[in-house]
Amino acid sequence: MEELQGYLEIDGFRQHHFLYPLLLQEYIYALAHDHGLNGSILSEPMENFSHDNKSSSLIVKRLITRMHQQNHLIISVNDSNQKGFVGHNKNLYSQRISEGFAVIVEIPFSLQLVFSLEEKEIAKSHNSRSIHSIFPFFEDKLSHLNHVSNILIPYPIHPEILVQTLRCWIQDAPSLHLLRFFLHEYWNSNSLITLKKSISFFSKANQRLFLFLYNSHVYECESVFIFLRKQSSHLRSTFSGSFLERTHFYGKIEHLVVVLGNDFQKTLWLFKDPFMHYVRYQGKSILASRGTPFLMKKWKYHLVNFWQCHFYLWSQPDRIHINQLCNHSFYFLGYLSSVQLNSSVVRSQMLENSFLMDTAIKKFETIVPIIPLIGSLAKAKFCNVSGHPISKPFRTDLSDSEILNRFGRICKNLSHYHSGSSKKQSLYRIKFILRLSCARTLSRKHKSTVRAFLKRLGSELLEEFLTEEEQVLSLIFPRTPSHRPHRERIWYLDIICINDLANHE
């Protein structure tokens, strides 16, 4: 970060709030392809960029020279050999500009976040980035709550909404105009594509810029929770560092007053709930509360009206589901979670009298949904839709050890991700499918039968699919008759994204 401050001469840029001159600096485009930045401080890790001839310094210098020319953007747009300004490999210069712009708009947020963490003396911890850290929180909190609400955050229906969101953070008008030009040019060239496909394609074309815009949009959608929490609770929440809090959010109260009533302070008490908890991953969030169903319905209508008034987003009622925790399971991060009532009988004796007391204990349970997981394996060509293993097509030049390593790595990653499951029977079936699919793949390669191939490999195939979790559990937990290894749950804090096979959305 010290090097970045030296590069940008941040004092001058912070004073004038100008970001667009940075597009004329070569190091910005180098930072766009620098592995050391790890994508973005505010977004999820990016994939590694390849240092090919497209990102050479010669092309960057030509780009900057062209940008110094008058009406360079108009010339690039009217070029007959180009189909658009954003997201196409044929337009190399415009692609480089959009990548450099993605780095520039992150600079104010990245620096403010780092300064805020240093002032509050918050230590950097990679464990806090793990999505598996959500489940220990569920174990501690959900057993005391009554209702849960599944919320799908709506997508922005127009690019101007994203620009208006950033206007409150970035005071550089030329940069906002350039962002508006990027988005409108892309949206107009893909007007016949559906919204979901359009956003998906744009996220692949410029993943860094898309993640930044999407994170800012999601934060705006959920900022109402931060505001109401601080207004209705005497205990201030600690700084999480996911996004910087906005002080101008109080200006949105006008919309809330129209929706909720004439006096905001009088209606605020309707949403006071000291036992309300909120978690989110990407566009799906969970809102759990100890309150009544009436309170949860108020939150539902409040969110719908807030999104409609402030973002002009129409959120369908079926995007917010309210259910009781005691008789409903909710799907989140590849797990089917629920709160089960486990009854136990306790015998108590006082002098000559004895009593039998039946107590119910709430316990948080997480299981692996087998049907969606088999569907993911079928989509990846490991089995059919019924779960019957099939041979996986691989290149013929791969050796047997490489095929074994690939199957074993897939099985270990999947078992590692689902290590927190309360019941491991589903994982045993998945391992069986992957193991038999591997055997069918190798037997097909050698033009042999599966039985003969399994007999020849024997323990080697079993050892390849023996996960580290099973080895660790055998060393930690004693082998006693009462011990059930398939009930032990382990949450690993090195997982920062959902497994591809476990993502059934």
UniProtKB/Swiss-Prot annotation:
Domain of life: Eukaryota
UniProt GO molecular function: RNA binding
Keywords in alphabetical order: Chloroplast, mRNA processing, Plastid, RNA-binding, tRNA processing
GO cellular component: chloroplast
Family matches, as InterPro entries: Domain_X, Maturase_MatK, Maturase_MatK_N
Family, per entry: Belongs to the intron maturase 2 family. MatK subfamily.
Record HAMAP family: MatK
Stated name of the protein: Maturase K
Organism this protein belongs to: Idiospermum australiense (Ribbonwood tree)
Gene name as annotated: matK
